[in-house]
Amino acid sequence: MGKIIGIDLGTTNSCLAIMDGKTAKVIENAEGHRTTPSVVAYTDNGEILVGQAAKRQAVTNPDNTFFAIKRLIGRKYDDKAVQEDIKKKVPYAVIKADNGDAWVATKEGKKMAPPQVSAEVLRKMKKTAEDYLGEPVTEAVITVPAYFNDSQRQATKDAGKIAGLEVKRIINEPTAAALAYGVDSKKGEQTVAVYDLGGGTFDISIIEIADVDGDNQIEVLSTNGDTFLGGEDFDVALMNYLIDEFKKEQGIDLHNDKLALQRVREAAEKAKVELSSAQQTDVNLPYITADATGPKHLNIKVTRAKFESLVSDLVMRSLEPCKKALEDAGLSKSDITEVLLVGGQTRMPLVQEKVKEFFGKEPRKDVNPDEAVAVGAAIQGGVLAGDVKDVLLLDVTPLSLGIETMGGVMTKLIERNTTIPTKKSQVFSTAEDNQPAVTIHVLQGEREMASANKSLGRFDLADIPPAPRGIPQIEVTFDIDANGILNVSAKDKATGKEQNIVIKSSSGLSEDDIEKMVQDAEANAESDKKFHELVSARNTADNLIHSSRKAIAELGDKVSAEEKEKVEEACKDLESVVKGDDKDAIDAKTKALEEVFSPIAQKAYAEQAQAAGAQGGAQAEEPKKDDDVVDADFEDVEDNKK
């Protein structure tokens, strides 16, 4: 059985870990980094770039460079958050798919579902693991924000499938971090608050770690969060400040210039990181734009105090879910024994200060905020594979689940923070006499009004025998698996007729869609391979042209004018095809140049070696004379001394 790898699929960065014996190990990517930017770019020549390579070219290719895709995953285009937040913050096109989902599109018009883009990041993780292990990897545990709803969880599973991974378990990020901490911690019973402020989402989980019959039991008591609060928002706050300051100085609004906007975004992210350790930083972007008077440069000093004032409301926004999570767990702040900080944004001193103020204790600094989640995912992978024996994980569903009942009310079957897996049934009836069918409208959320909650799906239970209203007994059962994904069934108790729905279509992707995307991904892998072969052929050709001309120049008059002409002609022939996309033509012309150049070079170098050999022979005789001279001198000196 192959390894089950652990992947933290983040909004900004992703991380990979595997179990190495009894411990989880974070694996470096091909570039030697322990985290990989969750950025995917589609270039003009059809190449797909992932990670650092994609991030590096974002400034020159803003329309086709996709970042923060996790904020779109499993969401509808008409969602308020998509309209108000995402569309205003990203340079690429967010479009409405035929099924109403939020998709993205390249400037060439290629439409893609968010799971399809995320799958490219997962595929890079998969390859990194395979390169490290030297064997195929087909199974993974992938983490999601605790506050992700059913649609977002299912969409994440779809992304795994498109990447060629069977997702054995979806686990919550704070839970994974607690798992990483809890497995190493041997301090007995603890109540831990995991404050997870990542690139795109915020979660708070209250978790109990206890020793139960020798097993490390990690039980989630409650969870809360905000799926639209993260480091990206901190970047945008600073970016908008820089743009506003530049507008005050120069009278030019950079919001409409995608290239400039991307440069300012990158500079804001860099400045944010620097301000975690420095009191002030300079943001210096020469030639950011130009007008009739000439080029303009952006040069703005930003102090830590200024940055903190720009984002203080974002930090304060994270504290409300903390209060709710404590209430749901039935605990007070004094009951918390440890506070863990997870997610790169928790490196910001203001965040650490406010968390310390809220919980009344110093957060732990010995947990790596970028890696803890992936480590926890790898440990869960080890549990599922049977390699880790003494850990029991009890997670919860983050939001209440129910159905729409008469009057447009949501009737809850499973309350939020219920330990999963779980199953719950309730009997409902008809609202009208002789009603032949009922529509089961499945909802997720905390509001009383059905329309104010997230719709997960609908299905009909038909062929109900005619009867007065209130007489038929329709048993509705909700069954949540360990991934937090829901199965709903409805059964007419009189006839035994049953209808059920796995909330699969909520990500908007059917099995056929996913299968097509898997095939596209495989085709992309093939085209990527062909592209790399083409680049390799071009490099070989360029090297041969350079070395041929250099050698002919060095050999000078040892090569006849006719031979020089032949080599130059073959070089020009190769140059005429080397920039094209026909690998066979490049290979053929490369071979032709080799066939012309090799015999000329061999002959010339053989003559050169022969001449050198003859010269060497002459030199070999000379030392004898020298020896005689030295000996004679030596004897002469001795004679004089006598």
UniProtKB/Swiss-Prot annotation:
Q: Which InterPro entries match?
A: ATPase_NBD (IPR043129), Chaperone_DnaK (IPR012725), Heat_shock_70_CS (IPR018181), HSP70_C_sf (IPR029048), HSP70_peptide-bd_sf (IPR029047), Hsp_70_fam (IPR013126)
Annotated region Disordered: the residues are 607-642
Q: Where is the composition biased (Low complexity)?
A: 607-620
Bias (Acidic residues): 628-642
Q: Which Pfam families match?
A: HSP70 (PF00012)
Q: Cite a single GO MF annotation.
A: unfolded protein binding
Query: Main role?
Result: Acts as a chaperone.
Phosphothreonine carried by residues: 201
Similarity section? Belongs to the heat shock protein 70 family.
Q: Which PANTHER family match?
A: HEAT SHOCK PROTEIN 70KDA
Keyword Chaperone among record annotations? yes
Induction info reads:
By stress conditions e.g. heat shock.
Q: What name has this protein been given in UniProt? A: Chaperone protein DnaK
- Gene3D superfamilies in the cross-refs: 1.20.1270.10, 3.30.420.40, Actin, Chain A, domain 4, Substrate Binding Domain Of DNAk, Chain A, domain 1
Keywords, sorted A to Z: ATP-binding, Chaperone, Nucleotide-binding, Phosphoprotein, Stress response
